[in-house]
């Protein structure tokens, strides 16, 4: 049987399942042993799995669990250090050449940690307001995409220092966002296209040094 070719470190933000953290090994080499089912299918050592949106390399597998190693710099810029035994985590395998792109391109490289400032429940719909680090605000646009804990979401509303996403019943049931509470910290990855656009537009001298905002992109013809 031919080996499946993987596009390394590319994800969709469509969580495949919630895993259960069975062991946290702290120390010079910080490791997490996680129980899963679907993500174990075809997974072997050196493959990539996104854990709460963080791309991590599998170093061990058995019939029920896999182990990933977390580098110090990753611990410092994500919320993985807060994970405890018994916690649920979002899991997604890296894209293969046959994968459908159901969400948006996610790299698994967290840009920062945001804080949930409010959760409002109306009937079956839940809206979540998140305050991101100020340096990320320029990359966030209304109706754009963002990955929260590895979940691809559409930005429903945008405020000066926060953004709002709507969570469907399916998302609440099948990801850890249904377990989150006000004040919780969440991993954020902005749409990589916005960062590429900033680099191209600023370096191209279209409007040198100007903040890339929704209004700026509209003037530049991207809306």
Where are these regions (language model features)?
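Conserved loop->alpha-helix
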Residues: 8-223
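Short, small-residue-biased leader/transition segments that mark boundaries at the very start
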Residues: 1-7
């Amino acid at each position: 049987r031919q080996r499946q070719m993987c596009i390394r470190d590319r994800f969709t933000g469509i969580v495949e399942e919630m895993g259960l953290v069975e062991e946290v090994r702290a120390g010079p080499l910080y490791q997490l042993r996680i129980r899963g089912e679907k993500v174990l299918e075809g997974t072997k050592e050196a493959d990539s799995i996104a854990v709460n949106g963080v791309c991590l390399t599998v170093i061990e597998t058995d019939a029920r669990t896999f182990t990933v190693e977390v580098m110090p710099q990753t611990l410092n810029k994500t919320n993985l250090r807060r994970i405890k035994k018994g916690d649920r985590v979002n899991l997604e395998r890296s894209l293969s050449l046959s994968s459908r792109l159901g969400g948006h391109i996610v790299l698994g490289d967290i840009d920062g940690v945001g804080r949930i400032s409010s959760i409002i429940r109306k009937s079956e719909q839940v809206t979540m307001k998140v305050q991101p680090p100020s340096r990320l605000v320029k990359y966030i646009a209304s109706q754009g995409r963002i990955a929260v804990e590895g979940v691809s979401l559409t930005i429903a509303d945008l405020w000066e220092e926060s953004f709002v996403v709507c969570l469907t019943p399916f998302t609440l049931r099948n990801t850890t966002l249904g377990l989150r509470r006000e004040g919780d910290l969440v991993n954020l990855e902005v749409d990589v296209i916005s960062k590429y656009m900033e680099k191209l537009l600023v370096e191209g001298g279209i409007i040198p040094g100007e903040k890339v905002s929704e209004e700026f992109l509209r003037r530049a013809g991207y809306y």
